[in-house]
UniProtKB/Swiss-Prot annotation:
4'-phosphopantetheine is transferred from CoA to a specific serine of apo-DCP. PROSITE patterns: CARRIER (PS50075). The keyword Cytoplasm applies. Keywords: Cell wall biogenesis/degradation, Cytoplasm, Phosphopantetheine, Phosphoprotein. GO terms for molecular function: D-alanyl carrier activity. Pathway: Cell wall biogenesis; lipoteichoic acid biosynthesis. The gene is dltC1. This is D-alanyl carrier protein 1. One of its GO terms (biological process) is lipoteichoic acid biosynthetic process. The keyword Cytoplasm applies. It comes from the Bacteria. Belongs to the DltC family. It is found in: Cytoplasm. The modification O-(pantetheine 4'-phosphoryl)serine is found at S38.
Amino acid sequence: MTMDDTKATVLSILADLTGEDVSSNMDVNLFDEGILDSMGSVQLLLELQNQLGIEVPVSEFQRSEWDTPAKIVAKVENLQ
């Protein structure tokens, strides 16, 4: 999977979970803006696992490392 494919998949998951298209602002803080909450985080991790085979235990989820679309894409790319 290319970097563009990964980015598109992550943005699609975020859009499905939040109802928001965040592709135009990859640095928006999803938590501060109320776009994503703790339940959404768990759903995000489950969808990343289902769609991309990325496993991130909830216990290892550091909110500050996953708070923008750009950070999420970078984390996923590092874990692939």
